[in-house]
Amino acid sequence: MTYGLILALVFGYLLGSIPFGLLLTRAAGLGDVRKIGSGNIGATNVLRTGNKGLAAATLLLDALKGTAAVLIAGHFAPETAVWAGLGAFLGHLFPVWLGFKGGKGVATYLGVLIGLAWQVALIFAVIWLAMAFLFRYSSLAALTAAVIVPIALYFLSAPQIAVLFVVMSIIVFIKHRANISRLLAGTEGKIGAKG
């Protein structure tokens, strides 16, 4: 791995590690989002505060971390864009500022995808929205989309980055293992539910 790739990975990690969900809820006087609901710092848990605007802002900013990392690194050296995106994804999952305990990575995953293959990002968004509308489970929507993305990349857009998204999708599944257990048990919280 060259110096440039390492630099892109570190840059992406630092950008991805900004915990927007935590920062926004604290700034709004809602306390520590890690102490409510699932304890996650992502948009779905921020929504459990009852503040839809903050949840939307968290979703947008967490996605932008991934997109910005890809586009900025790619501007200077196109071959580093993928590594910056991976760094942003890992930074969101394992932020140094929070003892390496971050979010589940779905919004940042989408942001990286927007930067690398926006057409497939649209497929992700359509699948997520359809599953969320039909079943009201954010986790199920995310997991379904994460299965489809590497396949879509391979056949429709960018087979050279499909392997990256296979790895990222596996990590998304690992981070959602508790959600998967709750889905199977019928106890998973639905979108918009407080607590």
UniProtKB/Swiss-Prot annotation:
Statement: the UniProt record of this protein carries the keyword Transmembrane helix: yes
The protein, known as: Glycerol-3-phosphate acyltransferase
Keyword Transmembrane: yes
SMART domains recorded: G3P_acyltransf
Matching PANTHER family: GLYCEROL-3-PHOSPHATE ACYLTRANSFERASE-RELATED, INNER MEMBRANE PROTEIN YGIH
GO biological process, one term: phospholipid biosynthetic process
EC top class named in words: transferase
Membrane topology: Multi-pass membrane protein
Annotated compartments: Cell inner membrane
Organism expressing this protein natively: Mesorhizobium japonicum (strain LMG 29417 / CECT 9101 / MAFF 303099) (Mesorhizobium loti (strain MAFF 303099))
